[in-house]
């Protein structure tokens, strides 16, 4: 469902459930020269700050994974995103994750 949501907004699917050694990404897409490494989370409740669903170490690992794939997919930058699902939400949360 997360991949379909991104594809509907013009992204091109690179991989689902991608693994490289100890690194793993739920979805990888690309759009306009940007490689998007996406973490998908499901929570029963919605916290005030959804970006806490992914810890900083995991964001760093996702960023490293994306950076290692840049040239292979002819992209110039990497963004790490969260797609969050909850029964309390009508639509999923989609937001960029900052590594700081």
Please give the residue ranges for each predicted region.
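Acidic-basic catalytic patches of nuclease active cores, encompassing PD-(D/E)XK
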Residues: 1-17
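Short, surface-exposed charged micro-motifs
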Residues: 17, 26, 82-84
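Short secondary-structure boundary/capping segments within folded domains
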Residues: 17-20, 28-29, 72
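Short acidic/glycine-enriched loop/turn segments that link adjacent beta-strands
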Residues: 20-23, 89
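Conserved catalytic cores of phosphodiester-cleaving nucleases, focusing on short active-site segments
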Residues: 25-48, 62
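Catalytic cores of nucleic-acid endonucleases
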Residues: 42-89
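Short, C-terminally biased terminal segments at protein or domain edges
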Residues: 86-100
